From Swiss-Prot:
GO terms for biological process: translation. This is Large ribosomal subunit protein uL4. GO terms for molecular function: rRNA binding; structural constituent of ribosome. It comes from Desulfitobacterium hafniense (strain DSM 10664 / DCB-2). One of the primary rRNA binding proteins, this protein initially binds near the 5'-end of the 23S rRNA. It is important during the early stages of 50S assembly. It makes multiple contacts with different domains of the 23S rRNA in the assembled 50S subunit and ribosome. Forms part of the polypeptide exit tunnel. Belongs to the universal ribosomal protein uL4 family. PANTHER family: 50S RIBOSOMAL PROTEIN L4, LARGE RIBOSOMAL SUBUNIT PROTEIN UL4M.
Length: 207
């Protein structure tokens, strides 16, 4: 079973924690992680792009000149896709890009991402994370004590407004509850900071 050091908010070690091997100790499946990231980013696309086809563009109903005898190439409409100001051929229309993955695949992707962070020693487990008031400077002190870099994801067992508001104005820092964890944020963060309670809840959800 993988083990990680548990630290307090001052960055001092206070013990060790054995992690569930099924959640934090598997061989990361890069293909599944890629699928999950592509699926998440695709679902965020608005897909509102639209072009005018030949039947939608204004004008062009009359033949511009007679078929024969002018010496020019034959033309049936001034809105042909070949013409300047003409319609678009096979252009994009509004559509949904999102696709859903099976629940097992989504969970495997999360377990793979968490395991990869453990392998890279980029998982920090906090004994507890509690602030008296929602102040950015208080969160900055904690992050500095933990030696967290520019991009980090803070995961708590449940939504905590003081934590969320304290980290909101810090560039590169995101906060989430266990239920809101997603593959993109996990992989896009240099460090994952999880409370001990969040680790326990994650193991319950993904086990």
């Amino acid at each position: 079973m993988p083990k990680v050091q548990v630290v307090n908010m001052q960055g001092s070690p206070v013990g060790e924690l054995e992690l569930d091997e099924y959640v934090f100790g598997i061989e990361p499946n890069t293909h599944v992680m890629h699928q999950a990231v592509v699926g998440q980013l695709a679902s965020q696309r608005r897909g509102t792009h639209s072009t005018l086809l030949r039947g939608e563009v204004r004008g062009g109903g009359r033949k511009p000149w007679r078929q024969k005898g002018t010496g020019r190439a034959r033309a049936g409409s001034i809105r042909s896709p070949l013409w300047r100001g003409g319609a678009v051929l096979f252009g994009p229309k509004p559509r949904k890009y999102g696709f859903s993955l099976p629940k097992k695949v989504r969970r495997l992707a999360l377990r793979s991402a968490l395991s990869s962070k453990v392998n890279e020693q980029k998982l920090i487990v906090l004994e507890d994370l509690s602030l008296n008031e929602a102040k950015t400077r208080e969160m900055v002190k904690v992050l500095q004590a933990l030696n967290v870099g520019k991009k980090a994801l803070i995961v708590t067992d449940e939504f905590m407004e003081t934590i969320d508001r304290s980290a909101r104005n810090i560039a590169g820092i995101k906060t989430t509850a266990v239920e809101g964890m997603n593959i993109y944020d996990l992989l896009n963060s240099d460090v994952i900071v999880m409370t001990k309670a969040a680790v326990t809840k994650t193991e319950e959800v993904l086990a």
